[in-house]
Amino acid sequence: MMLEHIPVLSAYLFSIDIYGLITSRNMVRALMCLELILNAVNINFVTFSDFFDSRQLKGNIFSIFVIAIAAAEAAIGSAIVSSIYRNRKSTRINQSTLLNK
């Protein structure tokens, strides 16, 4: 693939997931959209790291750190969602006021 195609793909993925995050009413779907946003950013890190300086792996290493942080965020987010589901029996964002108290 040429360099122009990959950032367009990443921007397309990013914009779809931003739309999904804004319009999502389910907490699990919002977490999935957030993970895909981070993956779109990782695609750009790896692409530009490979294109501009293929000898140094700064973009690749940074994307590995982002993946590790995203995994921790997913674990914490899913724990919060399961706790809210146990208490409220719903994963809808607009029905959950548990964290406001």
Curated annotation (Swiss-Prot):
Where does the record place it? Answer: Plastid, Chloroplast thylakoid membrane
Question: What single Pfam family name could you report for this chain, choosing any that match?
Answer: Oxidored_q2
| Catalytic activities | a plastoquinone + NADH + (n+1) H(+)(in) = a plastoquinol + NAD(+) + n H(+)(out); a plastoquinone + NADPH + (n+1) H(+)(in) = a plastoquinol + NADP(+) + n H(+)(out)
InterPro entries cross-referenced by the UniProt entry: NADH_UbQ_OxRdtase_chain4L/K, NUOK/Mnh_C1-like
Q: What is its EC number?
A: 7.1.1.-
A GO cellular component annotation here is: NADH dehydrogenase complex
Q: NCBIfam families of this UniProt entry?
A: PRK05715.1-2
| HAMAP family per the UniProt record, alphabetical | NDH1_NuoK
Q: In its UniProt entry, what is this protein called?
A: NAD(P)H-quinone oxidoreductase subunit 4L, chloroplastic
Which organism is this entry from?
Gossypium barbadense (Sea Island cotton)
